[in-house]
Design a protein with these regions (language model features):
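Juxtamembrane "helix exit" motif at the C-terminal ends of alpha-helical transmembrane segments
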Residues: 2-4, 65-82, 167-183
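Conserved small/polar residues in nucleotide/adenosyl-binding loops
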Residues: 16, 188-194
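N-terminal transmembrane-helix/juxtamembrane module of multi-pass inner/ER membrane proteins
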Residues: 18-57
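Hydrophobic alpha-helical segments of integral membrane proteins
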Residues: 28-43, 76, 114, 129, ...
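Multi-pass membrane catalytic core of lipid/isoprenoid biosynthesis enzymes
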Residues: 41-70, 146-156, 164
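Hydrophobic alpha-helical transmembrane segments
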Residues: 81-93
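Polar-ligand-bearing catalytic/cofactor-coordination segments
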Residues: 106-174, 185-190
């Protein structure tokens, strides 16, 4: 079990370095975002308390759905009776799924695009690239604030897209990594000023 988990982490990291995050509607994080977007209209309310309760129910629903799906998948794999087949299937699926919770290459790509634009003294391009990885308005940021924004984003996303998923995977397996991602995606979707809970 421990060897299997180590192999899964190794292959997931290798996949991230080789492939990165393909932009696709079939990415599990995109599915989580769509589920949240589907549930948000039911939570909107003029009462702040009711909207807060609605947001909590959305997060609870998303965590429950993600948890059930991943526990079910792990149970299905455990039913395979041939040990080597079970190991191969578990490592293959586990690596691919765990990779979808990790975003090292994608963050590196976006952060370097900002830094490269700053080094070329193209602050408009740097602001544009930065706007893809931060929530704040970047239109009037100077060079120091642009670099500060990149550093802040890389720091936050190191936790959200690397150490967090791996930590929860180490303790709870794939369900833990995915529930963690579901919580971080929920936070992002539910705290945008135009959506809910702000």
């Amino acid at each position: 079990m421990i060897l299997e988990s180590i192999v899964i982490v190794g292959f997931a990291l290798l996949l991230d370095f080789l492939v990165g995050d393909p932009k696709t509607k079939y990415h599990p994080t995109a599915w989580i975002g769509k589920l949240i977007a589907l549930l948000v209209p039911f939570a909107k309310n003029n009462s702040v308390k009711r909207e807060l309760i609605g947001g909590i129910l959305i997060v609870g629903t998303v965590i429950t759905v993600v948890g059930i799906l991943l526990v079910g998948l792990e149970f299905g794999i455990s039913l395979l009776t041939i040990d080597i087949v079970s190991f191969i299937v578990s490592v293959a699926l586990g690596s691919i799924l765990l990779k979808t919770t990790i975003a090292i290459r994608g963050m590196q790509k976006h952060a370097l695009a900002v830094v490269d634009a700053v080094e070329k003294e193209d602050l408009d391009l740097a602001r544009n690239h930065l706007s893809m990885i931060v929530k704040r308005d970047t239109k009037n940021l100077d060079k120091n604030h642009i670099l500060s924004g990149v550093l802040e984003s890389v720091s936050e996303n190191t936790v959200d897209g690397i150490t967090g998923p791996l930590f929860y995977y180490a303790i709870f397996g794939l369900p833990g990594a995915f529930v963690y991602r579901a919580v971080t995606v929920s936070y992002t979707h539910l705290t945008l000023p135009t959506i809910l809970l702000v």
